[in-house]
Amino acid sequence: MAPGEDAIHFELPQRWNDDYKPGTACSTPGDTGAYVTARDRWFKQTDAASVANHDSVDMPVTQTVTQTREQTFKVSAKVKGEGELAKIMTNTFGFTYVHEVHWKLNQKVGPYTLPAGQQGRLAWGFIILEAEGQNVRCTPDLVWKQSGKPYHISAPETKYAELQIDQAPHYNN
């Protein structure tokens, strides 16, 4: 699922600082960095299981992961030091960005409580942060200046699971 296609969207992270912002002061000529701007945060579903509770009491819902899933850090342009970019994003937004996130085989999803008379889907996948990046260089006059073209970043933040609940249909026989 691409961003914007029936994805569940989440609030964007707040910037913690203006480090590397083009036009701001820097201290060492020749230093390089990247200025990152968050654009979208969404749930990338990788798997789901339908669940229904036709009983009169709430019930716990769990699922065992049957396929290993992996989400990796992706950049639309060749960038020197993707690991360094992950560190910059961690410092900018306060979340820990890593190269990849996994759902492991036989890992448990849940438990979630499914109310009586309800149905739904237990869905799991990853929270993805879409961002734009711009490499910068510290000029001799101690100002961050754009270097190269802007690029797109798709960074996994964490594994995510949720129980999406609907009203269970009642059939008359």
Language model regions located:
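N-terminal hydrophobic or amphipathic segments with adjacent small-residue motifs
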Residues: 17-20, 88, 127
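Hydrophobic alpha-helical membrane segments, chiefly transmembrane helices and signal peptide h-regions
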Residues: 75-81, 127-131, 135-136, 160
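Membrane-insertion modules used to breach or fuse lipid bilayers
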Residues: 53-116
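Membrane pore-forming effector domains from diverse proteins
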Residues: 96-155
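Deployable pore-forming modules of oligomeric membrane-permeabilizing proteins
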Residues: 1-70, 136-171
